[in-house]
Amino acid sequence: MNQADLTERSDALQEQILNLYEQDSKDIQAQIQYWDLNRKLYVTYYYARKEGYSHLGLQPLPALQVSEYKAKQAIEMGLLLTSLSKSQYASELWGLTDTSAELLLTPPRNTFKKKGYTVNVWFDNNENNTFPYTNWEYIYYQDDIEQWHRTRGEVDYNGLYFTENNGNRAYFLLFDSDAQTYSQTGTWTVHYKNQIISAPVTSSSKQSSDDYTSKAGQQPHFFASSSSPTTTDGGQTSQEGVSSSTTSPSAVRLRRRRSNEQQRELSSRESPRTKRRRVPDEVDRQSAVGSAPTAEEVGSRHRSLPRSGISRLARLQGEARDPPILLIKGLANSLKCWRYRLKKYTRYFKCMSTVFRWVDIDVPESSRHKLLVVFNDTTQRDVFMKLVTLPRGCTYTFGTLNSL
């Protein structure tokens, strides 16, 4: 095609796009048409650039990389909207703003969203040190088998999340990351829809989950984590991975809550102070609160530590005897790609294995290959599970290792 033909084609496509703007249709088919026209327009621009043209009429052409990106973006939007049009939500109102690429990429990414509202976080409980976040009344997402679901955006002390169809919580924003920068004390309060959520008041007694919210009658939030039984060397079966599903403030603010006293405790492991506290009978008192574990004791525990009633130092020592792991099962290529992407999350785990598989075991191809991720403690693993998205189509289970 010569420059005149390309110019005519570009003008015709732009005219159709402008007509869609003027119509402002709320029908999903109109949005599919809009992105199809954008795809054709940027493919035309790409071809014209490849032919050496810098303008089509009075229209300057974008760089090749820009046209390629925009065309691929339009293809992606078209595919997602076509899939959505075959779901039960196709009859809802879908405007240009609801189906924009920018909105698709805002947290939570790769989901459609409607009716945003503001969540204000007061760092240090100071109204003058406030940061606004956007949450959504409705979030439309695809599950592992590409079925569409609609859910509500929710808020707790830790951040913004939505609950998936299987009951799992998917956090798409954690306040702790900004608190590292803007907060002096490591505390904040959350204000939204005439509700206030604050941290539990520190006391010597165990804090209830109800302390997370100041609204009377508000139910506490829990992070639903997958659990599966693991068998120990002695033949005992424990339910590893069953935990309270809301990460406590001490878990989320792990790096900030190390006080001077705790630092002194950590630095004096050679002669630790024996600090007696009330521990449930099923947990060995000496190993939970006593001296640091020896090399032979590492990995020797087969029971979970209590969630409260022991110091931070005692918890670290106790968990050293039972390093937690995450076993992921799936296709080899998916696991290898995911392992490569994990390089930016190295601070959230201790080490990981290469992709491997068991020999002489007949298992489905979808779960034949394995990958192990090892953590320093269960708190680190909980944070990892909230921040890192597991590869699609893979399954996982929790467990422990006696040694590495």
From Swiss-Prot:
Residues 224-250 have a biased composition (Polar residues). GO terms for biological process: DNA replication; DNA-templated transcription; regulation of DNA replication; viral DNA genome replication. It is found in: Host nucleus. Residues 1-204 are annotated as: Transactivation domain. There is a cross-link at K329 (Glycyl lysine isopeptide (Lys-Gly) (interchain with G-Cter in SUMO)). GO terms for cellular component: host cell nucleus. The keyword Repressor applies. SUPFAM superfamilies: E2 regulatory, transactivation domain, Viral DNA-binding domain. Residues 259-285 have a biased composition (Basic and acidic residues). Signal peptide: none annotated. Its main location: host cell. Residues 201-306 are annotated as: Disordered. It comes from the Viruses. Residues 322-404 are annotated as: DNA-binding domain. Keywords: Activator, DNA replication, DNA-binding, Early protein, Host nucleus, Isopeptide bond, Phosphoprotein, Repressor, Transcription, Transcription regulation, Ubl conjugation. GO terms for molecular function: DNA binding; DNA-binding transcription factor activity; nucleotide binding. Belongs to the papillomaviridae E2 protein family. HAMAP family: PPV_E2. Binds DNA as homodimer. Interacts with protein E1; this interaction greatly increases E1 DNA-binding activity. Interacts with protein L1; this interaction enhances E2-dependent replication and transcription activation. Interacts with protein L2; this interaction inhibits E2 transcriptional activity but not DNA replication function E2. Interacts with protein E7; this interaction inhibits E7 oncogenic activity. Interacts with host TAF1; this interaction modulates E2-dependent transcriptional regulation. Interacts with host BRD4; this interaction mediates E2 transcriptional activation function. Plays a role in the initiation of viral DNA replication. A dimer of E2 interacts with a dimer of E1 in order to improve specificity of E1 DNA binding activity. Once the complex recognizes and binds DNA at specific sites, the E2 dimer is removed from DNA. E2 also regulates viral transcription through binding to the E2RE response element (5'-ACCNNNNNNGGT-3') present in multiple copies in the regulatory regions of the viral genome. Activates or represses transcription depending on E2RE's position with regards to proximal promoter elements including the TATA-box. This is Regulatory protein E2. It comes from Human papillomavirus type 60. The gene is E2.
